[in-house]
């Protein structure tokens, strides 16, 4: 039940992606990107809705062709979550999706074209009140920067970003955020640190092409965790070669671990050993599966024996400490007379957790209406 994070957020300006506030102390937004063919409207809409169901604040959609832009029009009309159009190479696609109500435009400085093309996109975005993300990527830096630096470096990524920040500044356009992603953790982290010192615009965090579900989650947690702990970051995306739904789950888990933003249950569980009085691993796995729909932020400790169980239960909303045949149950750190049969733990705990989540949600609603 540790509520406050010691992290002090980097000051930044405020923009909006649809109805989602970004920067200036707003909650860090978690986003993902569809991996369907955008021209397959049905599949893309289904995936966006699945992402929204697990808490995605923003969803990015690749729009590589004019046909995809026409599909985007239908997709946008079919979903409620804010959509970012991912644009490369052809600036005219950005102009087209702007007509169709896109909530944000992501452009890549490495391939979007000359300043005149950027000017066209900016003027369109200004007219329609659409923010822009300048998305620098270590894998697609401008040729002159690669010639200058020989390889992606923090200085190269920074120069690419600032080159386009300066263009937007000259055009008096301040509704933008910036990212400087790389697949190497140290390269990405140092690039963001340099950028954070240069501008006050919101920063979108990510370790690009991080890898598969396990390795990519670890790499992202290490890199983004370093930045978030320093107060850097206003939105984030976990790039996994996996189901995009997993990106949202990992993103919230990272924020939850730093006490920056919580959604759903934070399970505190022992890895289990010979002292466990019930099967901790299967119990936790089943509860995680059953309780994915719970959005109330709460801590649940599930410990297999009395060594650490009571201590963890003291700082949990719901706690379970393994005992012989029956396990001890705690509510808000207080030991309850009720004990749970070890053969029926999952059903018993699920009921208690759901009741507690409902109680806590009602408490929050009452507080909001009285303030």
Swiss-Prot record:
Pfam families named among the record's database cross-references: GcpE
Family to which the UniProt record says this protein belongs: Belongs to the IspG family.
Superkingdom field: Bacteria
Gene name of this polypeptide: ispG
The keyword 4Fe-4S belongs to this UniProt entry's keyword annotation: yes
Catalytic activity: (2E)-4-hydroxy-3-methylbut-2-enyl diphosphate + oxidized [flavodoxin] + H2O + 2 H(+) = 2-C-methyl-D-erythritol 2,4-cyclic diphosphate + reduced [flavodoxin]
The protein's required cofactors: [4Fe-4S] cluster
Protein name per Swiss-Prot or TrEMBL: 4-hydroxy-3-methylbut-2-en-1-yl diphosphate synthase (flavodoxin)
Job description of the protein: Converts 2C-methyl-D-erythritol 2,4-cyclodiphosphate (ME-2,4cPP) into 1-hydroxy-2-methyl-2-(E)-butenyl 4-diphosphate.
Biochemical pathway: Isoprenoid biosynthesis; isopentenyl diphosphate biosynthesis via DXP pathway; isopentenyl diphosphate from 1-deoxy-D-xylulose 5-phosphate: step 5/6
InterPro entries documented for this protein: Dihydropteroate_synth-like_sf (IPR011005), IspG_bac (IPR016425), IspG_bac-typ (IPR004588), NO2/SO3_Rdtase_4Fe4S_sf (IPR045854)
Alphabetized UniProt keyword annotations: 4Fe-4S, Iron, Iron-sulfur, Isoprene biosynthesis, Metal-binding, Oxidoreductase
């Amino acid at each position: 039940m540790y509520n406050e994070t010691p992290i002090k957020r980097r000051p930044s300006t405020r923009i909006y992606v649809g109805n989602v506030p970004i920067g200036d102390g707003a909650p860090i937004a978690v986003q993902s990107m569809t991996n369907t063919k955008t021209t397959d409207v049905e599949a893309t809409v289904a995936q966006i809705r699945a992402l929204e169901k697990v808490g995605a604040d923003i969803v990015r959609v690749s729009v590589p062709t004019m046909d995809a832009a026409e599909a985007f029009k239908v997709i946008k009309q079919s979903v409620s979550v804010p959509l970012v159009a991912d644009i490369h190479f052809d600036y005219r696609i950005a102009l087209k999706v702007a007509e169709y109500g896109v909530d944000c435009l992501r452009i890549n400085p490495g391939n979007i074209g000359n300043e005149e093309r950027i000017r066209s996109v900016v003027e369109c975005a200004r007219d329609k009140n659409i923010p822009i993300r300048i998305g620098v990527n270590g894998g697609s830096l401008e040729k002159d920067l690669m010639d200058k630096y020989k390889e992606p470096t923090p200085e190269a990524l920074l120069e690419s970003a600032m080159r386009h920040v300066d263009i937007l500044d000259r055009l008096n356009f301040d509704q933008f955020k910036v990212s400087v992603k790389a697949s190497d953790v140290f390269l990405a982290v140092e690039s963001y640190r340099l950028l954070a010192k240069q501008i006050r615009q919101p920063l979108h965090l990510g370790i690009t092409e991080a890898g598969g579900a396990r390795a990519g989650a670890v790499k992202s947690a290490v890199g983004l965790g370093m930045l978030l702990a320093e107060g850097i970051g206003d939105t984030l995306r976990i790039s996994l070669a996996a189901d995009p739904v997993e990106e949202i789950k990992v993103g919230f888990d990272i924020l939850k671990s730093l006490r920056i933003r919580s959604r759903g249950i934070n399970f505190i569980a022992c890895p289990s050993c010979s002292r466990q009085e019930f099967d901790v691993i299967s119990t936790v796995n089943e509860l995680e599966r059953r309780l994915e729909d719970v959005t109330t932020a709460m801590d649940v400790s599930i410990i297999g024996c009395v060594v650490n169980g009571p201590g963890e239960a003291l700082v949990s909303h719901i706690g379970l400490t393994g005992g012989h045949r029956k396990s001890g149950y705690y509510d808000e750190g207080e030991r309850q007379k009720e004990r749970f049969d070890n053969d029926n733990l999952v059903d018993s705990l699920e009921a208690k957790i759901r009741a507690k989540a409902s109680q806590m949600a009602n408490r929050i609603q009452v507080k909001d209406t009285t303030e």
